[in-house]
Amino acid sequence: LTLLPSIINGFDRKLNFVSFTPGTSFDLKSSTGIQQERALLFHLLKKGWDLPHIPTCNVLQCDVADKDRWRATIKNYEPGLKLDKNIVDAYFVELSQYIAWEKQKGLPDIRSRFFDLCTRFSYYQQHKNIPWEKIRDRNKIIGELRAILARTCLKALEPDLVILDEFQRFKHLLNNDSDAGLLARELFSYSDE
């Protein structure tokens, strides 16, 4: 779901076929996602928030053991150059609203927390040597950024028909109030109204 800005450029076709899996497409906060998702976030955030290059690489590297391979992934991430402008713009609107909500609640906002992570990850460390507190904070923020991106993509998708192949694999999403369940129900019950 979070890769839609790089996969579909403009939803101007009569039919868009997008495949989702219950474990990876909807469960966003429990993990940092796959490399391509983080490379997409890198390109989105670096441009939109004017982030420092190397620290942002370090924050989003997560469990990729080889630093050079991760940096090559970012450098060679072709979709990062031609993202759907409407989704990108909508993502930063959603982020701004989320930041305003956090500030209203008296919480440190996600942008400030990400910049703080960039400071804390300003130099490269092997994953095994990163203190657990840094990993926990990083994973939480990446999960939040992915969740906001997923909601943004869901709104852009505007599905008229959702077909569940192997629907029994989605059953757990229909009857729970987790973030993944709420996101799935939002997709399944989308209305043009």
Q: What kind of region is each of these model predictions?
A:
Residues 2-151:
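Coupling/switch/interface segments within P-loop NTPase motor domains and analogous charged loops
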Residues 1, 124-193:
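Signature of the SF2 helicase/ATPase Hel1-core->accessory helical subdomain module
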